[in-house]
């Protein structure tokens, strides 16, 4: 196994996250369920990893015909939200069927939307 070094930065606010991520070779991390695996497999070798968990993007806003979800909301939290369960039950069902409880507890909604490469074999092949 080849070991390589990288810089880890914990961003406390959005300007700090943007500044840390502006350097070449930086990757943002929230749940890390994809990035950590890609780093282990040496598919990704970022020079800097920027932890964005301190940023305030964890809101879930349920309206009669709309759902707004912050990028840092965990899959578990979205699936368990009473408003989502009532108004958008198919989202709850999809989230609960999509991964193990351990992954759902770590994985962020934003990270799942922005996976590189996608984990879903369908999207990898299309």
Regions found by a protein language model. Give the residues of each.
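C-terminal structural segment of proteins
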Residues: 1-126
């Amino acid at each position: 196994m080849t070991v390589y070094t990288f810089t880890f930065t914990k961003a406390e606010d959005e300007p700090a996250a943007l500044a840390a991520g502006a350097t070449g070779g930086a990757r943002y991390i929230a749940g890390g369920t994809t990035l950590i695996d890609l780093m282990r497999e040496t598919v990704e070798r970022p020079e800097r990893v920027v932890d964005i968990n301190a940023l305030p993007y964890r809101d879930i806003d349920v309206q009669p015909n709309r759902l707004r979800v912050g990028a840092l909301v965990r899959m578990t939290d979205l699936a368990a939200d009473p408003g989502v369960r009532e108004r958008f039950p198919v989202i709850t069902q999809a989230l609960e069927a999509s991964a193990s409880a351990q992954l759902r507890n770590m994985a962020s909604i934003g990270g799942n939307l922005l996976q590189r490469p996608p984990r879903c074999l369908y999207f990898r092949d299309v």
